[in-house]
Structures are given as C-alpha cells and as structure tokens.
C-alpha cells in the first residue's frame, strides 16, 4: 500500500477534498479519520512518545537495589506509592534518558525528533497519543494528539463525612462552575500553536477522573454539597 506524508492511505478512489486538517468522515457507512490531504487515515499509535525516556524508576526506599547511580539522572518527582495507594514525592532515576545519552551522546532537539520519527515509522507506528512530547512529534512530522487540563475552579466538597471520595490522584472538579468554560478555553488556547499544526489529530481535555469503588458515590457526594455549590444547584 502507498501512504502520503501524514500516513494516510493514498488511494485516489477514496480521496476527499484536502482540508489542511485532520477531520472525520464516513466511508462505506463507517466513521474514519481523513488526513489533511483528504486520504483515509487509520491511527496506529502509542501513548507517551518522547526521546528523553518513558518515565523514571523510584529510588526512595529502594536504594539497595541499585549501584553506581549517576546523580545527573536523578530528580525529585511524584510517583504512585502502591503501599499507600496514592501519589507521593520521591527521588527517581531516568534510566531511559541515561541509556539514550550513553548510546547516542548529546543530541539537539531536531536530531532527537528525526531519530524518534524514523524509529516510529520503522516500527509501523504512525501517530503519537496522549502524554507524548507534542513538540517533538510535530518536529518529527508524526501525527499527534494534544493534551490539556480543564479549569479547576472549585472541587466537590460534600458536607457528609461518610461520603468520602477516593481522590487518589486528583480532586473532582465542579464542571458547572460559572467560570469553568471560560477558563478551560483559556487552557486550550495556551496550546493553540500545537493545535493549529496540520499534524494535530485532536485534543484530549483531562485524563480520566478517579474511579470510585462504590457505584453512585459521586452523585451522592454532589447532592451532599452545600446549597451554594453550582452542581448542587443544577441537580437539586
């Protein structure tokens, strides 16, 4: 099969008008992506694409497992503590970044982008999903997604102490706050340069929210909030 520069399936019988953007369309009654040149596009991608490592390995409390750790690759970060069931500050080492430097030496941003793009294409991967280095993917000319956070204007705060939410990685936002839409749009506009790239497939707003072990807990917590809370006003 022949593919265009965006990774779209270069078949003129399936081509639509070029829009300069990734869009959605139906072919044979089924939804599909179209790339900026109008060709059908199947996203065969992975999350967390980057050239500086896929994450850090915790050192705090595990020092005895390692030797000769180069402090240049050690940093303080927030990692998930399995025993405590929540995120906590810890020292961590980035072995991926260290190994990359050992094998390839110091490289410019452009060289890292070229390396990453060539590696992905060699593996048959044509797109970069959430948590990727968006600027690197754009430079590498790999279709990518942009990740932005919604506005955190206010959080659910139930009056009933028995309705305690399991907020293991983030608090639960009040999406009906009057400033929520305005502030979220401001957050999106902060990445407008990336979003306007022809290689941008689309935008994720927020990751998933903390799952609750008990069904309906979010709803009950919402109804237990003070009367002035925007969501309580909406659903009461």
Residue ranges and their predicted role:
Residues 135-140, 212-215:
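Substrate-binding cleft/loops of secretory-pathway carbohydrate-active enzymes
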Residues 207-211:
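Short, internal active-site loops enriched in acidic
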